[in-house]
């Protein structure tokens, strides 16, 4: 199985709890309409407020500027917009595929350019999942952590880093769930 197909399955489990039907309706990423994020959609859970690709995808799906602003602010009637999104599954899938490919490519390129090696190919999927959630920036916290490991990076190293984040301290169960999903998909395809 190719890396993109494997990563698609990882993201399906991590972002949608395994239920692909959730990709075609809007969800509140933090569950409390905190204002930190807008509504999210797609397999990759594009955050309308923080991901420019989300807006481009919605424009291609014929969402109006007012609808997109309402999704960003989370102050719009979501029911008709869910119907509109569900009519554009092929467009959403195409943007998801771009995002998945970009996550794998970006994580690989950042590490390769910095001389960071992986103890196994599984590590790339953990980093790509991190990138889909947070963005793996050159010189950022994760990148600095990886540079400091001083040996080939393991999946366990990524887990330890994530558990040290505010999200990891607040939701260690979610960090472990995501880690287990990645590990399980990896084992299902390569064991």
Q: Where do the protein language model's features map onto the residues?
A:
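Cell-wall polysaccharide-cleaving catalytic domain and substrate-binding groove, primarily
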Residues: 1-117, 122-191
């Amino acid at each position: 199985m190719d890396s993109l197909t494997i990563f698609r399955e990882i993201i399906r489990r991590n972002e949608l709890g395994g239920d692909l039907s959730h990709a075609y309706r809007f969800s509140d990423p933090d569950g409390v309409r905190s204002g930190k994020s807008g509504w999210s959609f797609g397999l990759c859970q594009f955050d309308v407020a923080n991901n420019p690709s989300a807006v481009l995808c919605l424009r291609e799906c014929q969402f109006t500027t007012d609808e997109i602003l309402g999704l960003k602010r989370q102050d719009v009637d979501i029911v008709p917009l869910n119907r509109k999104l569900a009519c554009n599954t092929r467009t959403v899938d195409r943007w998801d595929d771009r995002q998945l490919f970009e996550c794998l490519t970006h994580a690989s390129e950042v590490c390769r350019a910095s001389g960071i090696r992986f103890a196994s190919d599984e590590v790339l999927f953990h980093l790509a999942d991190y990138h889909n959630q947070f963005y793996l920036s050159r010189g950022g916290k994760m990148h600095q952590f990886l540079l400091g490991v001083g040996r080939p990076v393991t999946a366990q190293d990524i887990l330890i880093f994530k558990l040290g984040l505010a999200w990891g301290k607040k939701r260690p169960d979610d960090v472990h769930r995501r880690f287990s999903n990645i590990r399980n998909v990896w084992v299902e395809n390569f064991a």
